Amino acid sequence: MSFQQILDIYRKKSWNERNKGERFEMLMKRFLLSYPLYANELKEVWLWNEFPYRKDFGGNDLGIDLVALTVNDEYWSIQCKFYDEKTNINLDDISHFIANSNRKFLDNKGQSQKFSLCLWIDTKKSFGKNAEQLIKHQHIEFKRLGYYELDNASIDWQALADGETGKSVQLKKKTPREHQRKAIALAHEYFKTKERGKFIMACGTGKTYTALNVVEQETNKNGFILFLVPSIALLSQTLKSWLNDTTGIIYPVCICSDTSSSKVKSKNSDSDDTSTIDLPFPATTNVDTAIYQIKQRFIQQSKTGGMVIIFSTYQSIDVVHKIQQHLLSNTNEINDNNIFQSANNTPFVKIEDNSKYIFDMIVCDEAHRTTGIKIKGTDDSAFVKVHDNKFLQAKHRLYMTATPRIYTEEAKKKACQGYAELCSMDDIEKYGEEIYRIGFSEAVEKGLLSDYKVVVLTIGEDQIPASIQNAIADKGTEISTDSASKLIGCINALSKRMTLDSLNLRLCHNKWLILTRNSV
């Protein structure tokens, strides 16, 4: 049974709105204790009426439905909203939730505590610009789980609704396919003697999942990894897929910034349209905060095993550099439980082994983005800094792309003449050798991808809205008939809306050809 079907049942069978909300809150409590992204992070989740310190809030309806306690003894305030899709998000609800989440309370030791994160869970498919504007510049980090994140979660929703919790409601883990097993085996042999290598794999053939298996294999599911991506959207996607697909334990640390809340953007800003609000896990670019998180992750790793993984955007690579430099340069005494006596009965203290902070592997996704020019005497861009092992220390580097970027010899010569250096993916010193390749045509032949299709269609006047026709007629606008036709044609093709004329005209010549391909 799907998430949507569970929602439909709750809507039909709940006695009233309050009962519907209570059912959803209980479902979300079980979800947070079961979904891999949160299950290893949270050691307790309470309904508000179960929260042991609610008396400090006066006991009224504060807009806080759940409270979670993390393994690092931090508290999250959680709001669960079971909205109808047509219902607008109430901005007063958000304001009320944030205001009460800023209040402090005393724990059972008499220590003052505060919430470190606000998690907003709702059933809408979009959040809205007004809501996003409201939660910017808050003192407490704000995260949102919406309909799509919940609907796509690898969870048995029927079992969860029936009261089960934990690993029993997690869907069966997938296993590598034949081409992925080949890539994993080749990587294992390759990294025995080499430090850097490349996967050239067509989109849709499972680069991200293959990389996870390589990382698990090479670290025995017990390493320190850096995964770099060019956007927050890809970071979120990778974070969720790795947490879902791992057969071990992953302790994530997310490094990225939400530049959408800043008017000033640097050349290394995380420049994509995704806000960190929709990143389903806490993220930071504060060096001290990240160092604390990483050290806590290593404590967890020492107890139960697992991989400590930094998920970061390339644009935040300077932050990762500062974090690693600090961890490698600082020697720390380990706690009193590790004080020993020497042979002559002189006490000595065990010193932390900082070498564990050298990455076992750096995985560079969309590696063609790490190519480009390095001009002598100027700062390198964030994307090319990853190649420098003095900048980021790692035992191995894996570069992955579907579209390798290689510069011509002529371009390289011109760069040298201009006191510059080109980072090209045929540079073995920087990128290593090609470990495995599967191109688009081979993937189609193996049945892994759908082939391209040509969609031929025409645009009738009745399909062009009057507003666009007026814009075309207005010589002061930049839109042309040709541009408008292409835009409408693309929309129709992507939504698979075809007129009878378009279907018939597949057999003859047309004014417009729009090339698209099936989703893979």
Descriptions of predicted regions:
Residues 3-15, 31, 38-40, 48, ...:
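ATP-dependent helicase/translocase motor core
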Residues 59, 67-78:
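Active-site beta-strand-loop-beta-strand hairpin of nuclease catalytic cores
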Residues 223-246, 252-261, 314-316, 517-519:
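Conserved Walker A/P-loop ATP-binding site and its immediately adjacent core
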Residues 270-273, 280-308:
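Conserved motor-coupling elements within RecA-like helicase/translocase cores
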Residues 303-323:
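Conserved two-lobed SF2 helicase motor
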Residues 315-316, 330-399:
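SF2 helicase catalytic motif II
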Residues 372-449:
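Post-DEXD/H (motif II) to motif III coupling segment of the RecA-like Helicase ATP-binding lobe
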Residues 427-516:
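Conserved interdomain linker/interface between the two RecA-like ATPase lobes of SF2 helicase motors
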